[in-house]
Amino acid sequence: MNIAVAQSGGPTAAINSSLCGVFDEAEKYNEIDRIYGSLNGIEGILNDNLIDLKEVLITENDKQLLKRTPSTVLGSCRFKLKNSSDDDSDYKRITQNFAKHNIKAFFYIGGNDSMDTVMKLDAYFRENHIDIKVVGVPKTIDNDLPLTDHTPGFGSAAKYVATTLQEIIRDSRVYSIPSVTIVEIMGRDAGWLTASSCVLRANGEPAPHLIYLPESDFSEEHYLEDVKRISERYKAVIVAVSEGIDCLASRSEATDAFGHKYLSGVGKYLEELTRDHIGCKVRSIELNVMQRCGSHIASLTDLDEAWRIGAAAVNEALKYGGSGVMMGFRRISNNPYRVGIAPLDLSLIHISEPTRLDV
């Protein structure tokens, strides 16, 4: 028998570590002949665009390099499977290609939308009595997947955000003139990444002085009042803002295949608003894609956990017969920090709202 693995959605510093975990654990099973990598997510399965990972991951050095390489080495996609009840043509193509290569288990590394694909494929296989296991491996820097304690990729992105904010804060203080620096951080529905900037306060750093999250109502009037109030105490005001806050700049009607709005420009919008109403020196900084794949500052814990959860997915399918589940973290203790890994019911994840901060 053979297995296949694919990556989907936005890249991270840790997603290839999960791929390495799948590969390493699958190699331990004598019954597995080939470990296929699907190029560009589920599209690679549909188009029969597969590579044999055993032909490229030959030495231990190859695998260690993969574990520490950012982005998605197999490529990604944002392809949305239709409901099989409406159109099952893609499901039939996937089934045919799995049969062609004797693939009996499929592992999909991704976020909310990838888990939607896992659930749909598993349901189709069950309804048609097809013995193929499908297991999801979580990935998202937004940290908004329900039920799991956190997601691989978030730790490294949060570390990048906090470190970059610390450097911006130091840069902003060199001049005597008043200034406002607005840093736009990713997070469409949840503000975990933006909130991670406040870890600097644990060491007595007051900045960022203002933090705005999509979980809270946003008022331009209150924002301007906040900036004026803080500027009376600090000459260099630092604002951390999530791209998903509800302001004029975020109300685009353009969406992707999954119905998600394209977000951009919140920082620039607030820069112009601040300049028009307050008049001090203002600049906005959009961290954009840089926060996703900052391997130079990746979290070792994040990389290790990403590997572990990829390996656990293989055991869930091949050792325990699990399918239609996503592997997730469960917090065991905070001090010392310990987490366990367990399968989570994808139907519960699918009907749940994104995990958001309680503010």
Language model segments and positions:
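N-terminal phosphate-binding or glycine-rich loops at protein starts, especially the Walker A/P-loop
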Residues: 1-50
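Short glycine-rich or small-residue beta-strand-to-loop segments that form or flank ligand, phosphate
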Residues: 2-12, 72-78, 104-110, 136, ...
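Short, ordered loop/turn segments at secondary-structure junctions
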Residues: 8-10, 38-44, 78-79, 111-112, ...
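Short glycine/serine/threonine-rich phosphate/pyrophosphate-binding segments
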Residues: 12-22, 45-46, 90-92, 112-120, ...
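Glycine-rich oxoanion-binding loops at beta->alpha junctions
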Residues: 48-104, 113-114, 141, 152-154, ...
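Accessory alpha-helical/coil subdomains and C-terminal extensions
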Residues: 97, 105-110, 116-131, 151-283
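C-terminal catalytic subdomain
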Residues: 256-270, 275-328
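Single conserved hydrophobic/aromatic residue that forms the stacking wall/gate
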Residues: 350-359
